[in-house]
């Protein structure tokens, strides 16, 4: 099985890039390529990536005009030659040892979930323990804690992505990872789970960005887009009626929580205005009234504040 690692890059410091690249370069037996997609980084970053790829034949460097991480990942998907794709953020690393021994036994899957380790300073926390890989189980896990939303620590079958026209939504600036997985689920994939850690996610290197100040209205739309998609997926599931309603309530509580946090952030960076208020009002009014009645007290309080 040939694997394509896709690493989107935007102004990541060279010493952090080297940490990422070296974790992949240490793989010995697995046939792979590593596709570096430079999303318009400043000059010295591009030079470092180009030099590294020139000295490591399995690394391929491509530079493109800045279009966001979804655009970079999509470019990587189009260029990938491997049977499976594995996404790596440029400030994270893979757990090298497992890749040489992992690949056998999963060749028929369209998506293989693995586990990751969250690194937060000196603390490490394992994110894993999937209870199952049916549509209903994966969707429920996505709703319950959001720990499987990201594209990393997963092996995506390239042919399945192509046959179903699956790409990341380049119009979104937040929530695009979850929407990609939701769209994938809707295509009836064969999914498997490997109880093995393959990825180190470095929380301390994830600097806060300025998406809210730059794209406030898109951030609002993204919240609604993800919410509608999840409700649509819940409707398509084989849940009992009671469980289906419970999942919808939980997702509605999550939407309210996200909208409330977004409103506070927009106010703090001075981008809250009448247009934003109008968009919030429209989203809130479109939430099913029965669901609003059934959310918890904290959600009702937040909803009341946003309506005032």
Where do the language-model regions lie?
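Donor-binding/catalytic cores of nucleotide-activated saccharide
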Residues: 69, 90-194, 199-218
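Glycine-rich, basic loop-to-helix element that forms the pyrophosphate-binding segment
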Residues: 64-80
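Short, acidic, metal-binding catalytic loop of nucleotide-sugar glycosyltransferases
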Residues: 22-31
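N-proximal low-complexity "stem/linker" segments adjacent to membrane-targeting elements
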Residues: 1-23
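Short aromatic/hydrophobic "clamp" motif used to bind/position activated sugar donors
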Residues: 85
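A conserved acidic beta->alpha catalytic loop
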Residues: 38-48, 89
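Membrane-interface aromatic/basic loop that binds lipid-linked glycans or pyrophosphate carriers
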Residues: 61, 262-308
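Short hydrophobic beta-strand elements that form part
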Residues: 4-8, 35-36, 63
């Amino acid at each position: 099985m040939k694997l394509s690692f896709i690493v989107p890059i935007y102004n990541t410091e060279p010493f952090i890039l080297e940490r990422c690249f070296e974790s992949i370069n240490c793989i010995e037996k697995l046939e792979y390529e590593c596709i570096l997609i430079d999303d318009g980084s400043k000059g010295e970053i591009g030079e470092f990536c180009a030099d590294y790829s020139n000295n490591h034949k399995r690394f391929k460097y491509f530079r493109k005009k800045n279009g966001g991480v979804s655009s970079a990942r999509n470019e990587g998907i189009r260029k990938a030659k491997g049977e499976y794709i594995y996404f790596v953020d440029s400030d994270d690393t893979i757990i090298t040892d497992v890749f040489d021994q992992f690949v056998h036994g999963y060749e028929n899957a369209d998506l293989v979930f693995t586990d990751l380790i969250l690194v937060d300073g000196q603390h490490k926390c394992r994110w894993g323990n999937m209870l199952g890989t049916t549509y209903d189980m994966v969707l429920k896990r996505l709703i319950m804690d959001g720990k499987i939303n990201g594209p990393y620590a997963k092996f995506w079958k390239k042919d399945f992505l192509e046959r179903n026209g699956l790409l990341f939504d380049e119009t979104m600036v937040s929530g695009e990872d979850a929407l990609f997985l939701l769209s994938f689920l809707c295509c009836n994939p064969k999914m498997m789970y490997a109880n093995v850690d393959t990825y180190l996610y470095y929380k301390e290197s994830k600097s806060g960005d300025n998406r809210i100040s730059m794209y406030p209205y898109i951030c609002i739309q993204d919240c609604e887009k993800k919410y509608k998609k999840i409700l649509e997926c819940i409707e398509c599931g084989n849940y009992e009626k009671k469980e289906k309603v419970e999942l919808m309530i939980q997702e509605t509580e999550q939407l309210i929580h996200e909208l409330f946090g977004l409103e506070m952030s927009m106010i703090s960076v001075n981008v809250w205005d009448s247009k934003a208020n109008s968009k919030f009002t429209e989203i809130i009014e479109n939430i099913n009234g029965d669901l609003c009645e059934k959310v918890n007290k904290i959600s009702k309080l937040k909803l009341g504040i946003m309506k005032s």
